[in-house]
């Protein structure tokens, strides 16, 4: 090319192309804010009171177990009663199938007792008692709930686990009841404004 080097092999066009891809070539990333222990405390106050329903206690228990055990939704909803073992100061969860478990061997997750209102072990015991799930049961822990008009109570229904979409909806509704937006940071500002109510 007339004695000149090829301009396409220069670093400048590669950097320009990469910069263009970074600014306009990719979809906007909607980064979510993490759930904090303070948010969990407010969830427990709202959903985990002594007179709460089975539906509210399920919501609280799902949030606490998934937070304390670093569980994904799929791992949480596939927990069975036989996968839980209570000990004096902790409980162990056996995760049968996980996204990161390449050989499908399963793994155990230990969750410690705390003396706080956000104790996942105590909340799980309360949930199991209220749901009438016996220790020898092999049923899913989190199942759909039906409302009984005659007795004015909630009861677990069926033998199938809670669908992923419903579990996600329960969590988002619980966060929404605290004033948190389901999208990005605008909910955090709203949460800070209404925090004094709880």
Segments predicted by a language model, with ranges:
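Extended, non-catalytic subsegments within catalytic or DNA/protein-binding/adaptor domains
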Residues: 1-198
């Amino acid at each position: 090319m007339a004695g000149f080097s090829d301009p396409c092999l220069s670093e400048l066009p590669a950097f320009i192309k990469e910069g263009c891809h970074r600014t306009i070539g990719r979809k906007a990333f909607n980064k979510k804010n993490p759930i904090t222990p303070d948010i969990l405390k407010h969830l427990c106050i709202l959903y985990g009171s002594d007179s709460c329903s089975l539906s509210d206690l399920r919501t609280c228990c799902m949030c606490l177990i998934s937070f304390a055990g670093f569980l994904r939704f799929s791992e949480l909803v596939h927990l069975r009663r036989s996968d839980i073992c209570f000990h004096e100061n902790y409980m162990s969860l056996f995760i049968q199938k996980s996204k990161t478990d390449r050989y499908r061997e399963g793994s155990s997750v230990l969750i410690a007792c705390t003396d706080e209102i956000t104790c996942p072990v105590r909340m799980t015991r309360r949930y199991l008692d209220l749901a009438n799930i016996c220790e020898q049961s092999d049923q899913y822990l989190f199942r759909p709930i039906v409302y009984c008009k005659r007795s004015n109570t909630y009861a677990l229904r069926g033998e199938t686990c809670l669908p992923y979409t419903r579990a996600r909806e329960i969590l988002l509704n619980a966060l929404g009841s605290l004033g948190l937006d389901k999208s990005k940071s605008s909910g955090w500002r709203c949460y800070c404004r209404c925090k004094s109510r709880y």
